[in-house]
Amino acid sequence: FFFKQNTAYEIGVRLVGSEMCIRDSPATVTIIGGGVVGYNAIEIALGMQANVTVLDKSAKRLDYLESVFGDDLNAVPANSESNETFITAADLLIGAVLVPGASAPKIISRDVLKKMKPGSVFVDVAIDQGGCSETSRPTTHSNPTYIEEGVLHYCVSNMPGAVPLTSTYALNQATLPYIEDLANQGLIQALTEDLGFCQGLSVHQGKITIKVCLLYTSPSPRDGLLSRMPSSA
């Protein structure tokens, strides 16, 4: 617990200052990836009155984020030029890149990262998928940070483990409705009536039903595996 608190304090001091020396300007936060992790990072950073930029390849996702956060958020299409511009300007850089079923791409090169301001912070949430920077390596809750090229790196695998009780409660709350549907409706009916649930199915009847795998079989209730099965299966 001490290590977790100490790490949070250390990062916080770098971003907003301490009780003895408060920053005279808002921190600059750059978030790479506008998915679920990126969305929540934006919320927290804006709540800390930071200047926030999110980089994402999807124009549709950027439009959505702008519709939610308005002018408070700087939403920028991700490319090599914009990535370098906003990475090197950041006080806090958050890697929130996820490619389902694959290792995270190395979006951040060492050459770009070394241009960041000394004492800046990099949090690689993608470390569970290998990390999105050439400078990333997995760390632990007991030894969470290291400095590389003058930048403080936080690359802890399984970050929710820092707050195990809270994260377990949140996971239970998120999964309970699906468990109740399975119990009340049975597998086939639950999957048939909930498209999102069906898309989360990975293996069924000896078939791989997740698209990122090569030997993929569609589980779609319309024309896939589930459409060929009796409702009592």
Per-region residue spans from a language model:
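Single conserved hydrophobic/aromatic residue that forms the stacking wall/gate
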Residues: 1-17, 22, 216-233
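Rossmann-like adenosine-cofactor binding region
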Residues: 69-149
